Amino acid sequence: MAEEIRFFELNTGAKIPSVGLGTWQADPGLVGNAVDAAVKIGYRHIDCAQIYGNEKEIGLVLKKLFDGGVVKREEMFITSKLWCTYHDPQEVPEALNRTLQDLQLDYVDLYLIHWPVSLKKGSTGFKPENILPTDIPSTWKAMESLFDSGKARAIGVSNFSSKKLADLLVVARVPPAVNQVECHPSWQQNVLRDFCKSKGVHLSGYSPLGSPGTTWLTSDVLKNPILGGVAEKLGKTPAQVALRWGLQMGQSVLPKSTHEDRIKQNFDVFNWSIPEDMLSKFSEIGQGRLVRGMSFVHETSPYKSLEELWDGEI
């Protein structure tokens, strides 16, 4: 019998459900139905962010699900993220309060620094003049206060390289519980995964299918012949194999879909596994990062190159 891998334990002792519904690029008007369908299918983990612009709609649906007795608040694991315009320590609690208000919650289970980048307060877009020097230790102190208050049951980071995570661990009183990064068979993050594991930081993978629904990212992750071959042998879809690979590598996965049939398919990853001989073939897959963060790279930015933004993990 395959090991189900329904949860991973965080360094706080809390359990994070291994499959969460991603809501990035989920259009308002569709995201509510997606969350409703996902929870009824069995998802207990919803990945949100203020910058996605859909937390209000998600909040309305969550309230309806809680009020209707479909699921209890304590059975759900809700993540949100601090956007780059709120890195000033005084802005951090305000940002979370706004998210809590929109989601109609008293607390989030996980609150992440979305990017290791500071943008001018109130700015939209990524004009070079909006990119400020970063002070992650100060922002993290404010995050620790949210953890102390109970409004964020766990805190963590997103899009942090091994080096940036190592630097934060040196100064952190409360170590990050999670580093959420792009991760899929065509961007496996082996160096970062090993580092996170060695420090007790859980790796969570966004775009685990390579963002097939986006128009501005060219993604052939699911068309990879190795993935296709394994899927065929196991009688599964390439998407299911990509997700199950993530679970077997020890990371939670956050597939995004607004189609009920795919939301259901993406959850069918528990009662089977990829045999070791097939798993080893994944090391032959060519690697390439899709979400590169070019918007944050400029000669006047703290990051003059992608090399600097990712500290060589590119």
From Swiss-Prot:
InterPro entries in the cross-refs: AKR, AKR4C, Aldo/ket_reductase_CS, NADP_OxRdtase_dom, NADP_OxRdtase_dom_sf
Source superkingdom: Eukaryota
Binding site for NADP(+): 23-24, 47, 114, 158-159, 180, 207-213, 256-258, 262-266
The enzyme's E.C. designation: 1.1.1.-
Top-level enzyme category: oxidoreductase
Modification N-acetylalanine occurs at: A2
Chain positions found as Phosphoserine: S295
Family: Belongs to the aldo/keto reductase family.
Function statement: Oxidoreductase that may act on a broad range of substrates such as ketosteroids, aldehydes, ketones and sugars.
Name of the protein: Aldo-keto reductase family 4 member C10
Organism for this UniProt entry: Arabidopsis thaliana
